[in-house]
Amino acid sequence: MASLDRVKVLVLGDSGVGKSSLVHLLCQNQVLGNPSWTVGCSVDVRLHEYREGTPEEKTYYTELWDVGGSVGSASSVKSTRAVFYNAVNGIILVHDLTNKKSSQNLYRWSLEALNRDLQPMGVLVTNGDYDREQFADNQIPLLVIGTKLDQIPEAKRNEVLTRTAFLAEDFNAEEINLDCTNTRCLAAGSSNAVKLSRFFDKVIEKRYPREGNLIPGFSDRKRFGGGNFKSLHYD
């Protein structure tokens, strides 16, 4: 079998939001029975069919890098974590729908990864406000995923989803809200599956540009440069 081209996607978010469960669901199509804290970084692989069902269909390795730790970590921890931010092609920002703070912290996570050589300035996360200029030059495709949808009472679900909807707009990204304990939430043909496929297609088109497929407004980002990993762990 010929070697497959690959893309690297970071999975970022506070500890405990369900990143490991999400990655396992995306890569194995199974519920993770006993999730544990990620130390350093855990990498798993999902095979993605680019433009499935079209003449351009092609299989790619999508490496999902689940980065552990807290956004409020000491500078030494952040410096160590920065090694995982090299050669990134896409970012999945994960927050817990039952934890408002985890939603607000996505701004810090994104800035830490996108501006890893800079000190974030003008960012306020106490009430969800932030400086849009920080994201004006972002050229990395983003996807926002809210987890633990099953833990929100039906009566409060609309209120919570309305509160978190601004995240997708702020990051100029699509939004998926799901329950990582239910494999049907990403069933083929569902709106969630379509959004996920569309995101991976964008990541691939950015990494391997094709004439007429360039993402509008995106250009080469020098800070991020351009295998087959399977459940590797970096401590």
From Swiss-Prot:
Keywords: GTP-binding, Nucleotide-binding
Start and end residues of each stretch annotated as Small GTPase-like: 1-235
Protein origin, superkingdom: Eukaryota
One Gene Ontology term of the molecular function aspect: GTP binding
Binding site for GTP: 16-21, 148-150, 179-180
GO biological process: B cell differentiation; natural killer cell differentiation; regulation of protein lipidation; regulation of Ras protein signal transduction; T cell differentiation in thymus
UniProt keyword annotation of Nucleotide-binding present: yes
Presence of the UniProt keyword GTP-binding in the record: yes
Protein family (similarity comment): Belongs to the small GTPase superfamily. Rab family.
Subunit note: Homodimer.
Role summary: Required for KRAS signaling regulation and modulation of cell proliferation. Regulator of KRAS prenylation, and probably prenylation of other small GTPases. Required for lymphocyte development and function. Not required for myeloid cell development.
Record protein name field: Rab-like protein 3
Organism placement in taxonomy: Eukaryota, Metazoa, Chordata, Craniata, Vertebrata
Designated gene of the protein: rabl3
